């Protein structure tokens, strides 16, 4: 172990159910702090840089083409996309009719983006599916 940081709590550098981690091209460590409804950002030594609180239970992040993609698990659910500096680019959610296998948009658990920009989201709970979103 080279270094560790954080403890349970609600302040900067404290966490409530860490859910995913990503390191961007500038070596910033981006962490989904799910139960605190935020994304916390640190330098690679663990020094707190900032937090983004305009999220609902962030479950996973993915970085592609200088954009940060986040799948959210809260009551609004959905996907948010920001620039690396934290400017919101897009946000959407989806609600299906609740039929088995259709998903709800609330249970997003994982996210990735392919080379053509299509976004894949895994859903847990009633949906239990993989959803693919493409630009139109």
Protein language model features and the residues they cover:
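Eukaryotic scaffold repeat domains enriched in small/polar residues
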Residues: 1-136
């Amino acid at each position: 172990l080279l270094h560790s940081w954080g403890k349970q709590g609600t302040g900067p550098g404290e966490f409530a159910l860490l859910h995913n981690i990503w390191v961007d091209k500038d070596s910033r460590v981006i962490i989904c702090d799910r139960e605190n409804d935020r994304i916390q950002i640190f330098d690679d030594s663990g020094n707190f840089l900032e937090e983004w609180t305009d999220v609902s239970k962030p479950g996973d992040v993915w970085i592609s083409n200088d954009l940060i993609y986040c799948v959210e698990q809260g009551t609004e659910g959905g996907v948010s996309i920001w620039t690396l500096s934290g400017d919101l680019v897009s946000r959407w959610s989806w609600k299906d009719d609740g039929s088995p296998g259709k998903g709800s948009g609330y249970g997003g658990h994982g996210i990735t983006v392919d080379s053509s920009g299509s976004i894949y989201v895994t859903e847990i709970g009633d949906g239990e599916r993989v959803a693919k979103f493409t630009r139109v």
